[in-house]
Swiss-Prot record:
Gene Ontology MF annotations: mRNA binding; structural constituent of ribosome
Domain of life of the organism encoding this protein: Bacteria
Organism: Syntrophus aciditrophicus (strain SB)
Family affiliation: Belongs to the universal ribosomal protein uL13 family.
Listed name of the protein: Large ribosomal subunit protein uL13
Function summary: This protein is one of the early assembly proteins of the 50S ribosomal subunit, although it is not seen to bind rRNA by itself. It is important during the early stages of 50S assembly.
Complex and partners: Part of the 50S ribosomal subunit.
Pfam families noted in UniProt: Ribosomal_L13 (PF00572)
PANTHER family according to UniProt: LARGE RIBOSOMAL SUBUNIT PROTEIN UL13M, RIBOSOMAL PROTEIN L13
InterPro entries: Ribosomal_uL13, Ribosomal_uL13_bac-type, Ribosomal_uL13_CS, Ribosomal_uL13_sf
Biological process terms in GO annotation: negative regulation of translation; translation
Amino acid sequence: MKTYQAKESEVAREWYLIDAEGQVLGRMASEIARRLRGKHKPEYTPHVDTGDFIVVVNAEKMVLTGKKLRDKIYYHHSGYPGGLKEKTAGKMMQEKPTDVLWLAVKGMLPKNSLGRRMLRKLKVYAGNDHRHEAQCPKVLPL
């Protein structure tokens, strides 16, 4: 008997809705990454994108534990000499809370083209409104 390997065309994809209000960032991000990879499915195959679509609302109301709002620093580089920029998690949560969750999930996915394709299935919104009612996402309790 041959080992089953899923094909991209045979994978049934679901849409899930997650309410981030009161959820801890890291715990929520790890569950989102698991669902984006498809590891919760019996037909999971490491080299095939078997994951589902995830819509996250209320990203501005998620929780960072401890002193992370003050102490956690996000870095990026402009590409120019002396262009290393940094922001605290508190400032990021004020300006763009969607990026905080997006970066946390990005760090938990594979660092290759498959990981980038998985990340495109993540839709994050700061408020309660989203544009995916037509897909009828199922509410995913965490």
